[in-house]
Amino acid sequence: MQYIKYAFLCLLLTFVCSVEGRATSGAVPLAIYPQPLSCELSLTEYTPFDRIVVCAEGHSWVAKHLKSWYGKCAPQVVVDDNIANESAFGDEEYEIIIDSEGIKVRARSLQAVRYALYTLRQIAIPSRGTEQVEGWIVPQGRIKDKPQIEFRGVHICWFRETEPWEVERQIRLAAYYKMNYAVIESWGTFKSDVAPWFGWPDATMTKREIKRLKAIADDLGITLIPQINVFGHASQARGYAGKHAALDINPRYQPLFEPLAGWNWCLSNPETRKLLQALIKERYEAFGCPPYFHIGGDEAHQPSCPDCASKPYSQLFLEHIEAINETISSLGARTMMWHDMLIERGDSRWQGFVVNGSKETAAGFLKFPRDIIICDWYYDGAQSAYPTIDYFKEQGFSVLSCPWNNTGGIIAQSRYAHKSGIMGVLGTTWHHYFGGSLPNIYYTLANAMWNPEAHISTSVNDYIRQMVHTHIRQIGWDMKLKNPRHAGTYYEEIPPEPFLNN
């Protein structure tokens, strides 16, 4: 049998292949994202995907999804109780064995079975030689796999311009790429019953829509985490836009915000905390009571409110975060927040890294409850060390490393997270959830978080991009898309005329 052996520590593109014997001329391996820890697949020997053996715990989920993916050609699902008790396997660990006798999945949990099925879907192709699909085949071989980082998350923004299908597609892609958490940040788009004025009138992030997305996420094995900004970014809008999702339409609520642009919440106003606590409880319940809640906390301004300025701001800041954290803890969740306001700008220890805090906020941070999770964001290229991560870890906090769209940075930060033993990685997307950025972010992030020590290409070339497009197309089938605008990664194949460079 002619095999490709994927030795991931010396990976070239998605795989580096060492082939026993002569491979078929021009044969191209199918890509698996994220890269499995160990994978050996044939280039030429295939098995019909008409029967699969799984443990009892995953039986109903597997049967449902195979029917959804493959319709009348769905493989028969067989339960083997002998593979259910894989005591040596971790909760997310699986093994796939494909030979002439069929396909067997070894795993001990539903989540691991899900991951095995996502892998199989990426390597299954229609039987050849027919006009329409009449069956499926998979390459023979063996895959053994498990994640190297525990918390593998992505941060998704829901802007006023964002349509619900775009959020759903990102959730589905994150789950397909074996991420286990997705933070959903509303940018004035959550329709609140507690404070109907707090957001844009045409908000699309309704409780009904969240319930629908949560059901999808739960089924696919990814947990949704809500976010409300409780310090800076109170405008729920990008700074460059100059908008304020509350005050532009409802100026009577100005006392809740700092006078300077309303960018900060007013921490000295007791009504501010009362409102935020009510909003947090509402959002937490809308998201089905998840284990975490993100409170933002980045890029705040110095106080312009005379009441805030006249008080020891370090104490005001500390009391505010303590109260918010106590509310979240009482709900049964842990607080997550960005790091940049927690260290002092001008401190030479942080030169070259993201620092927006003052002496006051840095001092207040030292007294924070240690159950808060610090989300350390850095969006530039690879660094040999990340002193801010080390600092927060040394202070006794759980830490997540948070890259954005720099491929080298995503890889380096994921490797540093793995090496330093912190909680994990939370990749960010911001307003780059379409076009060329989408394949770059999700491909690099998924691979770096799952198997950080593997070689991962920093050049998202046509081959890699096309494989991501293939996976996005599969997600489009799951979403039963009909609108051509919802296909691919660009809304339009040719940009509008003013943007054409003739």
Map each language-model feature to its residues:
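Substrate-binding groove of N-acetylhexosamine-processing glycoside hydrolases
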Residues: 31-47, 55, 61-62, 152, ...
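A generic structural motif
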Residues: 71-86, 131-134, 183-190, 402-410, ...
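Acidic, contiguous N-terminal accessory segments
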Residues: 21-143, 337-338, 342-344, 359-360, ...
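Conserved short loop/turn motifs at secondary-structure junctions
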Residues: 22, 198-202, 405
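Positively charged n-region of N-terminal signal peptides that target proteins for export
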Residues: 1-6
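Bacterial N-terminal signal peptides
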Residues: 7-16
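Short, solvent-exposed amphipathic alpha-helical segments in soluble enzyme
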Residues: 66-70, 120-122, 170-171, 390-394, ...
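Feature activates predominantly on carbohydrate-active enzymes
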Residues: 35, 89-329
